[in-house]
Amino acid sequence: MIEADRLIAASGRDREEVQDRAIRPLSLDEYIGQPVVREQMALFIQAARGRGESLDHTLIFGPPGLGKTTLANIIAHEMGVSVKSTSGPILERPGDLAAMLTNLEPHDVLFIDEIHRLSPVVEEVLYPAMEDFQLDIMIGEGPAARSIKLDLPPFTLVGATTRAGMLTNPLRDRFGIVQRLEFYNDKDLSTIVSRSANILGLAIEDQGAYEIARRARGTPRIANRLLRRVRDYAEVRGKGQITKAVADMALNLLDVDERGFDHSDRRLLLTMIEKFDGGPVGVDNLAAAISEERHTIEDVLEPYLIQQGYIMRTPRGRVVTRHAYLHFGLNIPGRLGEGGDFSEPGDE
């Protein structure tokens, strides 16, 4: 199974990039959710513009699909400058980075997605560019090689990553602003769904938007993807209007349940419960039982289930929690305890 094949995958798809561009917010006023990040960035941007300076280099990290690219574009828009975009894997040689840096105008934004994947040799070139706005490049080869310095216009590097822990300390320390994006709550996601529907010219009720939002795993990219699929259902079977009932029927047809789980999530949980008595079970045994690769379980399936409190990692292996039994309407084993709060995660 490939992550991008799943309807609820947080990673982006090439065609979606074009579709999402039409519904992306362009300013902080349009930006929904992440209140702390929004307030801080508004303050930093206003201060930088007031001084006539470029914004400090900014690192944005968090799970995929939460709007890191969107925020980078908003920063450029609010600063009134252009944004040049690239990604870590694309910048293979120092010359690739040098070409982008030398084409920047004063105060422009250079956005590097997946910045944790920069090669060490490219990263070394980036250090003086970030710190001193200078580019050190080598001319010639062998004994005749010499280093020259090129002055760069002041610019803002905005780096985005899903794995902040993989950044080297020297690179991380050169960012003056560091922002973490959190998963969205259902209310903010519902507002995002309603806004996207309005831009796309769709008729949607508030309850319909909320039904989509609560199954979107706290991720705007997934919410917008589900909205497009529910739109298809509404146009064919729902008279074009997205109500709560239409959204519920569409998402059930798409095999996305009320917790945002799909078939793969449920199969993993049920396998642990039915074949391994809830665990502990080693990841290799689990991979063999559900015919998946080990890395698929570790990188694709597990993270959301752990974050939502349905699976725990222990020294002896993976264990399901009482919430997994409750989700499927199963009796909770006595070893998990009879007392305490048996509500599912997220319930009040």
Curated annotation (Swiss-Prot):
The encoding gene: ruvB
SMART domains per UniProt: AAA
Alphabetical UniProt keywords: ATP-binding, Cytoplasm, DNA damage, DNA recombination, DNA repair, DNA-binding, Hydrolase, Nucleotide-binding
Family indicated by similarity: Belongs to the RuvB family.
Protein name: Holliday junction branch migration complex subunit RuvB
Chain sites annotated for binding DNA: 294, 313, 318
Gene3D superfamilies in alphabetical order: 1.10.8.60, P-loop containing nucleotide triphosphate hydrolases, Winged helix-like DNA-binding domain superfamily/Winged helix DNA-binding domain
Binding site residues for ATP: 23-24, 65, 68-70, 131-133, 174, 184, 221
GO cellular component, one term: Holliday junction resolvase complex
Gene Ontology process terms (BP): DNA recombination; DNA repair
Region named Small ATPAse domain (RuvB-S): 185-255
Enzyme Commission no: 3.6.4.-
Main location: cytoplasm
PANTHER family, alphabetized: HOLLIDAY JUNCTION BRANCH MIGRATION COMPLEX SUBUNIT RUVB (PTHR42848:SF1), PTHR42848
Region (Head domain (RuvB-H)): 258-348
Recorded catalytic activity of this chain's protein: ATP + H2O = ADP + phosphate + H(+)
Enzyme class: hydrolase
